[in-house]
A protein has these predicted regions:
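Nucleotidyltransferase catalytic core that binds NTPs
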Residues: 1-207
Length: 207
């Protein structure tokens, strides 16, 4: 009798800071894809980010706090520890080698799906993992027209996307950082431990 195939999700991001939409996406992926485990990976040196990220130690700590109570989530530090540019394809290859026979599911948020065609070796990513995207990112094509290459219906890649049903959550790290800079409350957007960490370390403050 053969053992069941392990179903492993992979959710990466800057998590600068992690917020409630990240948690909702993780919980949706675990439930809808019937995952045995979801690896959450804060990025290291993000080649595609024009904005300088917060220190890796802060983003890692906030990510651990944010996902601490989500069953089946494992915060994976490998991209933070990796020297040089961080590429998702390298992480997927490592996970495949470490978990032979496992089925990999790459979980993307709306913003990531829009520019998936610009990712390093995106064709190889699609061969290694099943790409799963928050439904709004692949159903609202008029919103997916920004960027150098997007995930609209004219792009062949969305044919390989598996939709995840997600509530409409107008939350973003950009909005949270702006609220902090404007001395506004962020508790409706992040968990209490993350809000406390941000306050304790005075992250994202402009003055």
């Amino acid at each position: 009798m053969s053992l069941p195939v392990k179903r492993m999700g992979v959710l990466g991001g800057a998590f600068d800071p992690p917020h409630l939409a990240h948690l909702a996406l993780a919980q949706a992926a675990i439930a809808q894809l019937k995952l045995d485990e979801l690896r959450v990976l804060p990025t290291g040196q993000a080649w595609h980010k024009t904005r300088k990220l917060s220190l890796a130690e802060h983003r890692l700590a906030m990510t651990k706090l944010a996902f601490a109570d989500v069953p089946k989530v494992v915060v994976d530090e490998r991209e933070i520890r990796r020297e040089g540019a961080t590429y998702t394809v390298d992480t997927l290859r490592e996970l495949r080698a470490e978990n032979p026979g496992a089925e990999l599911f790459l979980v993307l948020g709306e913003d990531q799906a829009r520019v998936f065609g610009t990712w390093h070796e995106f064709e190889a990513i699609a061969q290694i993992a099943i790409i799963c995207v928050a439904a709004r990112a692949i159903l609202t094509n008029d919103e997916a027209t920004s960027g150098t290459q997007n995930a609209s219906s004219s792009d062949p890649m969305p044919n390989h996307f598996h939709p995840l049903k997600m509530p409409n959550m107008p939350v973003s790290a950009t909005l949270i950082r702006a609220r902090i800079a404007d001395h506004q409350d962020i508790l409706p957007l992040v968990t209490e431990p993350v809000a406390r960490y941000i306050a304790n370390y005075h992250l994202f403050e402009t003055t």
